[in-house]
């Protein structure tokens, strides 16, 4: 079965047609040189099944990305963010699934007690172990950029099925140009 990196689709409910918002948020919460990662193993028909991702989700009607960020972090982790940094805008494209715009945040300021998540298992993963996890190829790129850069960046990631075919930084630098086939 072909999966997709993207979750927004048309939903038909009675007489109304609902379109899932193509704007999402993702946050990497940091503590003691580790990131809080979500191992997506609990949801059926999950496009992120068996992947390790940060915490986040779709912006809902009437929300700003920051409203979504706070809501999703609390819903999925039980933590309350006290502050955060808007680090990047990630544009995902895939033929047949449209475009998704992800607001990427980091935070090292939060309160609360970690709770069980119904989407997967939450785990503090040391930063030097992140690359060994089952991540989307594009996620590896923005992890590297988060480490290397203190400035905001824009990254366009294009997937063909589950394969990353394009990664363009700030609209001009092709990050896959030297990749081995």
Where do the language-model regions lie?
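Unchanged
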Residues: 59-82, 92-146, 167-181
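A conserved beta-turn-beta hairpin within the catalytic core of GNAT-like acetyltransferases
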Residues: 46-50
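Short glycine-enriched, charge-decorated loop/helix-capping segments at active-site entrances
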Residues: 52-58
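Low-complexity, intrinsically disordered or signal/transmembrane-proximal segments
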Residues: 2, 8-11
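Conserved N-terminal beta-strand and adjoining loop/helix that marks the start
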Residues: 10, 14-37
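Short, active-site-adjacent segments that bind or coordinate small-molecule cofactors and metal centers
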Residues: 146-166
């Amino acid at each position: 079965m072909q999966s997709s990196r993207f979750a927004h689709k048309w939903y038909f409910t009675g007489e109304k047609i609902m379109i899932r918002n193509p704007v999402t948020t993702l946050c990497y919460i940091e503590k003691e040189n580790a990131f809080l990662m979500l191992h997506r193993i609990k949801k059926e028909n999950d496009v992120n099944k068996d992947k390790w991702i940060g915490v986040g989700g779709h912006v809902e009607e009437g929300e700003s990305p920051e409203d979504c960020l706070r809501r999703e972090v609390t819903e999925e982790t039980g933590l309350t963010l006290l502050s955060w940094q808007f680090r990047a805008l990630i544009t995902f494209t895939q033929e047949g699934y449209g475009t998704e715009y992800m607001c990427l945040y980091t935070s090292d300021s939060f309160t609360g007690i970690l709770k069980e998540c119904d989407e997967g298992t939450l785990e503090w993963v040391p930063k030097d172990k992140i690359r060994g996890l089952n991540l989307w190829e594009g996620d590896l790129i923005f992890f590297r950029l988060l480490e290397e850069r203190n400035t905001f960046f824009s990254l366009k990631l294009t997937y063909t099925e589950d394969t990353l075919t394009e990664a363009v930084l700030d609209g001009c630098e092709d990050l896959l140009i030297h990749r081995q086939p």
